[in-house]
Amino acid sequence: MPVKGLKVEAASIDPGHDAVILNPRDAEHLGVVAGLRASVVCRGRGVGAVVIVDPRVPERVAQLTKGLVERLGDCDTVDVHPIDVPPSFDAFKKRLSGARLSAAEYKMLIADIVAGYYDDAQIASFLVSQLYSKLADEELEHLIRAMVETGEVVKFGEPVYDVHSIGGVPGNSKVALLVVPIVASRGLLIPKTSSRAITSPAGTADTMEVLAKVAFKPQELHDMALRARGLIVWGGALNLAPADDIFVRVERRIGVDPPTQMVASILAKKLAMSVSRLVIDLPTGRGAKVQDESEAELLASMFLAQAGRLNIAMRVAITFGGEPIGFSVGPALEAREALQTLMKGDGASSLVEKACSLAGLVFELGGVVPRGRGYSLACEILRSGAAYRKFREIIEVQEGDPDIKPEDIKLAPKQFTLEAPRDGIVTMIDNRAISLAARAAGAPEDKGAGIQLHVKTGYRVRKGDPLLTIYASSDTRLHEAVRLLDEYNAVLIEGVVVKVLP
């Protein structure tokens, strides 16, 4: 029998997951066990949480972690009781065995995962099962729709456009800061929801946050988008497909990102934003998530198959991802480069060509221009200053300063410049080394940290020329970033003469 009406207090600890902290006497009376899960119920809605027992907690008090409070809402009291086997457990075991699940089974399973009735080990096994027992197209559609149904859906009453990159390439987060205003300047609605960085030095939301606020409620997002026609906001504050946030957290811990789950997560978020016209960017190359073109084409076919099922008009671009995009890596540095490019109407070819190519595909999807003409229109909008003017509107509607200049953006105070050890030609810039070093320097948590590149592949350099500059806020972080660059040989320089034969 559950103890009724435990008084709610905020927990002073954050174990990294939803937890309820109880006095040992209450835990014993409830029949709940430390380390296992219990259902915490507020106004008839139950959420699963790990039980922690602490004698310092007063009796008949339930201390709730911050995330649990946010999920339950405003509650003065809660009931706590042991979790029985969730209704979806048979479906869960069925999926682990490799059998297919129905739409109803996925709906029940995802609802129970969101409610907290599965622990991280069980969720990890669900994710790993997709590696050795791939989801069929119909089953993947069921998963996507179930993920959408458990969260908010924002509706706009008109066609919604978006561009989504699977990421994995340093410097990629700033591309959206060009694409969105280019597209929005022609009146197309592109309220882009973006993630924070997971394993990279900057996510699009991290970079945009240097310039404006990115966390808004669904109704705020709706109203702002209709005013500015374009937004760049953080999706994590919107409760869109909340199962995705759970899956991402577990994927980070186990180092697994099944392709089917990647497709499901991306498309569920897009459906929750009522996106009906979507461009997918698959960066491909050494050090990217996708290593070669054949792998990219396989992933593209998965996206396109689901697009047909979900009534999304889609095009997939396989883009070069063999080295960083543009010259900057890290939130503040990337915000600077994006702003400079918009103000000048030109910039690094890898950044401008990618942004205009993706924006051009959106124009073609929307019927603004015929196929093959989108790129030139996007470039014209960028060069004319129309994209910069629209970006100022977006910054202002997101409560930022539209008059901000690149030089106003502060960088971390500690610097180290890596110099060329010899004359030669830059033959490789290692994505992994750049990402690791930028994160070691403090990015993305320290927005001013990161790496500014001074060269790209193909540049001719002389001994002592600057190759890149690292920015960090402490000597410790700076030294670790330098160590990683040296260990991984981040910038490879070859002599002009490769070999001499007699």
UniProtKB/Swiss-Prot annotation:
It is an enzyme of class 2 (transferase). The active site is at D257. One of its GO terms (cellular component) is cytosol. Disulfide bonds: none annotated. Pfam families: Glycos_trans_3N, Glycos_transf_3, PYNP_C. GO terms for molecular function: 1,4-alpha-oligoglucan phosphorylase activity; AMP binding; pentosyltransferase activity. AMP binds at G168, S195, R196, A197, I198, T199, S200, T204, S265, K289. Keywords: Glycosyltransferase, Transferase. The keyword Phosphoprotein does not apply. PANTHER family: THYMIDINE PHOSPHORYLASE (PTHR10515:SF0). This is AMP phosphorylase. It comes from Hyperthermus butylicus (strain DSM 5456 / JCM 9403 / PLM1-5).
